[in-house]
Amino acid sequence: MKKMLVEFRDFALKGNVLDLAVAVVIGAAFGKIVSSLVDNIIMPVVGVLLGGLDFTKLSVTVGKSVIQYGAFIQSIVDFIIIAFAIFIFVKILTSFMKKKEQPVEETPVPPTEEYLKEIRDLLKEQQKEI
């Protein structure tokens, strides 16, 4: 049992697990921001463009049940905006990583310099022979 607790502690304290936990917390906070953006800015504008339609109040009553499809539409818009924001973030991040990984190319040596180096080396060899 003690070995299992030690293994769990080692697993939980690994950098990847902690990074994932931080990402989940930040993602949840980001989701709240996007939901607020959709609920308070985007959907009211869409509602005005559609003739004063308030999506939060769209519903259908079936028997004693109320189906709030307006809230569902808002959830879809939330998802699309969050997915697009994550896509843009990942795209920017990968472009930075690609720039960082690209090796610096050496400038090619002009042929005249190569010839001069060969002549120098030949002259050194001739002087050694003398």
Curated annotation (Swiss-Prot):
One of its GO terms (molecular function) is mechanosensitive monoatomic ion channel activity. It holds the Pfam family MscL. It is found in: Cell membrane. It is a multi-pass membrane protein. GO terms for cellular component: plasma membrane. Keywords: Cell membrane, Ion channel, Ion transport, Membrane, Transmembrane, Transmembrane helix, Transport. The chain crosses the membrane at residues 11-31, 70-90. InterPro entries: Mechanosensitive_channel_CS (IPR019823), MS_channel (IPR001185), MSC/AndL (IPR037673), MscL_channel (IPR036019). It comes from the Bacteria. Homopentamer. Channel that opens in response to stretch forces in the membrane lipid bilayer. May participate in the regulation of osmotic pressure changes within the cell. Belongs to the MscL family. This is Large-conductance mechanosensitive channel. It comes from Listeria welshimeri serovar 6b (strain ATCC 35897 / DSM 20650 / CCUG 15529 / CIP 8149 / NCTC 11857 / SLCC 5334 / V8). The gene is mscL.
